[in-house]
C-alpha cells in the first residue's frame, strides 16, 4: 500500500512543473467555448482569493494519453527499468520469451491488462517504487521533453506486434484554466 501511495503522490507531484510554467498574469480562457468560458469566469470570480481549491484528474483530463504507460516505456528505453531489475513480488506471471523475442516490461504490462485492469494498474504504479521523487521527476521531465512516440514490442495473443506509445500532451485549455485559477488565489491540485 505504501508503494501505491508513493506512486500516486509522485503522479501528482510531477505535474507541478507544467502548472508553474503556465501561470502568468491575466490568463484568458481562449481555448474554451464562449458559454463555458463565461461560466468559468463567473465561478472563478465568485471563489477568488478565499482559500478555495480545485482538484482535477491527470490522465486524459489534464493531458492526453496515459502517464504510467508512457513512463514505463520511457524508463525501459533509458535502462532505468528492466525485467532484470523487477522485484520478485511484481513477477505475477512468467515472462513469455521465444527464441526470437525476449519480452519487455511494456509487453508484460499489456498482458497483465488483458487479464484484468485491477491487476495491471496497481502493478504499473508499483514498478516505480524504489525511485526517489527527484529521480522519478527527472524521468517524467525527460519523457515530457522527449515529445516523440515511444516504440515497444508486445504480444497480441501469440503474435509479436509493435506499439507506438505517446507521451502525455497537456491540453492547452486546461493549462489556461489552471493558470487562471491560481492567478485568482485558487489552489490547483492535479491527481
Per-region residue spans from a language model:
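Bacterial N-terminal signal peptides that target proteins for export
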Residues: 1-9
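Bacterial N-terminal signal peptides
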Residues: 8-18
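Boundary at the C-terminal end of the N-terminal hydrophobic targeting segment
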Residues: 16, 20-27
